[in-house]
């Protein structure tokens, strides 16, 4: 992705130079992590909005979404640079409260996207309906299982609102609607794909009769795919994943993944910038925007509307 990295660096430098100047609008966008495919897709939406709306964007975030200290530093840096507005996907719903309140008190409007923060004075909160998506994931996994069986959850990390809500939705739906299913393991991968493989392998070893796994994030999914393949359990242990990458799609095609829950991160990034653009121009965007997640099965993969989600044209252009 060298072409894209060059563009990112150039646009960030241009935006940085513009900060503090006259009436030039610079919107700072802070993802949870720059290393995940999900946020690469968010970035593409951010860039498209910047082009369409003729604003500059300063994109900066921690490499890993467990690094809330780095995200706090970035917020404070953007305050010091006097950006016009900030959009953020918070690594932790509590740790980011004070820095974002500092931004708001300094006159910088803030939009929250993907993962919430415990503040009230934000412009807009834009996210997938994560609790509902978790409920849907539970129903989807249950549909692949026959009779009473054990299931497990490979989870992201504590404190990340988006994934916590998915996990709560999954767990509550299993308990209420599928009493024949028992959740025998709930383990965090701490947003690390390598660690998620170890977690999933440990679960599979401890529960040889496991019927299914729900992996609540991109990292959790990638490790779970590897663990199931490594034990030759593709198709035997049903796996419902969240988010997408080339690995997810290949695993759905070969039967390792039974279903993918897919968001629309491009739209998420676009709307985050758009909400702040509207605010900076005296408009009032919706306080909350919920974007749906979709269930994708193997039979759906070649449908044009699904291809636009899992293999968007912009991705081909940047590889």
Q: Where are each of the predicted segments found?
A:
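Short, solvent-exposed amphipathic alpha-helices that sit
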Residues: 38-52, 133-137, 161-181, 195, ...
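Flexible loop/hinge segments that line or gate small-molecule binding clefts
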Residues: 93-132, 139-143, 150, 156, ...
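Extracytoplasmic "Venus flytrap"
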Residues: 28-45, 49, 53, 58-73, ...
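Hydrophobic alpha-helical
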Residues: 79, 87-104, 170, 189-251
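N-terminal export signals
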Residues: 6-20
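Hydrophobic alpha-helical segments within soluble ligand-binding/sensing domains
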Residues: 71, 126-151, 165, 195-197, ...
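Hinge/cleft segment of the Venus flytrap/periplasmic-binding protein
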Residues: 158-162, 173-174, 267-319
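Short beta-strand elements in bilobed, periplasmic/extracellular small-molecule ligand-binding domains
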Residues: 53-62, 153, 177-189
């Amino acid at each position: 992705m060298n072409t894209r990295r060059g563009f990112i660096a150039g646009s960030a430098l241009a935006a940085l130079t513009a900060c503090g100047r006259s009436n030039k609008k610079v919107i700072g966008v802070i993802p949870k992590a720059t290393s995940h495919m999900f946020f690469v897709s968010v970035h593409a939406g951010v860039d498209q909005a910047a082009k369409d709306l003729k604003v500059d964007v300063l994109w900066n975030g921690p490499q890993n979404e467990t690094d809330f200290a780095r995200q706090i530093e970035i917020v404070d840096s953007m305050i010091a640079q006097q950006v016009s507005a900030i959009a953020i996907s918070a690594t932790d719903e509590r740790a980011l409260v004070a820095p974002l309140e500092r931004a708001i008190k300094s006159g910088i409007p803030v939009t929250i996207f993907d993962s919430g923060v415990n503040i009230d004075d934000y412009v807009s909160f834009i996210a997938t309906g994560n609790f509902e998506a978790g409920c849907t994931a539970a129903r989807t996994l249950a549909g692949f299982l026959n009779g009473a069986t054990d299931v497990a959850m490979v989870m992201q990390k504590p404190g990340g609102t988006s994934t916590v809500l998915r996990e709560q939705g999954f767990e509550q739906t299993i308990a209420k609607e599928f009493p024949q299913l028992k959740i025998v393991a709930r383990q965090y991968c701490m947003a690390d794909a390598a660690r998620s493989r170890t977690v999933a392998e440990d679960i599979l070893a401890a529960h040889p009769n496991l019927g299914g796994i729900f992996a609540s994030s991109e990292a959790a999914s990638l490790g779970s795919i590897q663990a199931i393949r490594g034990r030759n359990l593709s198709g035997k242990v049903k796996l419902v994943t969240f988010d997408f990458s080339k690995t997810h799609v290949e695993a759905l095609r070969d039967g390792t993944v039974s279903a993918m829950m897919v968001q629309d991160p491009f739209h998420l990034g676009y709307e985050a910038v758009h909400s702040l653009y509207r605010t900076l121009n005296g408009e009032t965007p919706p306080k909350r925007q919920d974007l749906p997640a979709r269930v994708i099965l193997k039979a759906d993969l070649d449908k044009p509307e699904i291809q636009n989600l899992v293999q968007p044209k912009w991705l081909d252009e940047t590889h």
